Amino acid sequence: MKKLLIYIAAFAMILAMNTSCEDMGSLEEHPKKVDATTFMANAKEVESVINSIYFQLRRDPGFSRYLIVLEEGLADYCIGRGNYATAYDTGLTSGGVGFSKDSWAVLYRAIRFANNILDGIGNTPLSQQEYNNLTGETRFLRAFAYSWLARNWGAVPFFDEQNMNDFNKPRTPEADIWKFVIDEADYAASNLPEVAKAAGRPSRYAALALKTEACLYAGRYEEAAEAAGLIISSKRYSLVEVGKADDFLDLYGHTANATSEEIFYIKFNRDSGSTIAYMYLCKPNPFVNMGAVGIYTDYQKNKFIQNWDQNDLRYQFGLYKQTQNGTLNALTK
């Protein structure tokens, strides 16, 4: 069980074998470059374009559903169902490609918005602090998107504001992608505020957290420890105290917000259209009847669940049991 933060999203499978729930089509959207002479005329207008990056990340193929299921379906504690089962079994069936290509697309769309902003922001009349904060946030989000591309696909095509109109580019080596993410995180950490200007937006410490993770992927362990140490020494964050299973509601519950553990997060609720909850149920079940929903775990057959210490508070909080066709299943909350 993981927290609904930047590392968790939920996914659904109400679709045909070769299509995904939200039809992303292709990347051929006939995009129009932002004209800084008619738009991005001030800091608020730049922020409105930055919000478009967040919108891409929050779409169904992003962190609302598909993106993480490709990883969750591979976890020892989960079993994929329907098209999500193919991500575990083969990875590249027609159904599996439908999900992964859409996740790929939203990440590159987020990058495209970031590149457009960085290409045009030099024409916007801004104070030095506004420029630093806005470019820091934009470059953080672009690096964040590249980090998810690299962790899922390794070497990927690379586009920035200098070459964003080049097409049919070959893949850039994975090591170069991680170097870019680390360099961008350094810039963001130097230009973002100590305290995020709004909930859900990045701060200096979000950039340091991104650098920490990127350095681990890149095998730059001393730099990872140094960046993490700066977060720890700030004393701005701490673990939520848990003494009984229900205390996890203080961290994962629907009323939890801006807890002491949260550095950067993308959150969803019932009204936002996210389907995270039902993606962790199997069908049929007494809670929701909505297709052959996504991932769950089998209590009797899954060795990870069988061997999990039932005195572990995470076990007590994160699993509940349901009978399906005479088989007892444990489902993540």
Identify what each model region corresponds to.
Residues 1-8:
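Bacterial N-terminal signal peptides that target proteins for export
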Residues 42-43, 47-51, 55-61, 83-153, ...:
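Conserved, well-structured interaction surfaces
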Residues 85, 89, 98-102, 233, ...:
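Elongated scaffold/linker segments in the mid-to-C-terminal portions of large proteins
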Residues 4, 21-70, 306:
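Acidic, glycine-rich segments characteristic of secretory precursors and extracytoplasmic regions
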Residues 64-81, 159, 193-210, 216-283:
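Short, surface-exposed recognition loops and adjoining beta-strand edges that mediate ligand/DNA contacts
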Residues 14-18, 146:
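Bacterial Sec-type N-terminal signal peptides, specifically the leucine/valine-rich hydrophobic h-region
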Residues 31-34, 92-95, 160-167, 244-245:
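Short linear capping/connector segments at secondary-structure termini
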